[in-house]
Amino acid sequence: MSHLQEEYIMFRKMRRAEKKAIPNEETIRLLQESKRGVLAVAGDDDYPYAVPVNYYYDAAAGKIYFHSSLAGHKVDAMKRNPKICFTVYGEPEIKDLDWAPYVKSVVVFGKAQPVADPEKKRAVLKTFAMKYYPNEAEADEEIELDFRAVQMIEITIEHMTGKEIQEK
């Protein structure tokens, strides 16, 4: 079975999927090309807590990775409950001279956990850094400065959908 698991009862089906769902290839491309997403966790007193994060998507493993400090609101929330929702959306696009833009988005449900193995953490952090830094030397320098002060969080995808809506 692929990392995109079959539909389970615990995840709702997308409304009007026949009109709004985008192909899996587009969903993956949006995850690979976007630079920021919004991570939502069950925060303090069960209030939702959503925060933008930089990330990278490892298509081969079917995992999403982002970096975090070692402590804080989202870290505490993920320790209490590893279930997360992660959303990425693309740039608005005008089609066929229509006035209202179309926007593609991806919504991921999964479980988050810190990358515990230091070697894996370093490898994941390097791949992450190469998405954002202009060259390997700068990425390596930043990793050496901050390696002990950051953690890499791995999201195991349990359910993922992609869709396109017209905002009108």
Language model features with spans:
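Charged, gly/pro-rich active-site loop segments
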Residues: S2-E18, E93-K168
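Short, basic/aromatic recognition patches
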Residues: F11-V38
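A generic secondary-structure signal marking the coil-to-beta-strand transition
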Residues: T27, K35, G62, P82-I84, ...
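A generic structural signal for nonpolar/aromatic side chains embedded in well-ordered alpha-helices
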Residues: L30-L31, A77-M78, F128
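Short beta-strand segments
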Residues: S34-L70, F86
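Beta-strand secondary-structure signal
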Residues: V38, Y65, C85, F109, ...
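Well-ordered beta-strand positions
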Residues: Y56-D58, K79, T156
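Helix-adjacent hinge/juxtasegments
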Residues: S68, H73-P101
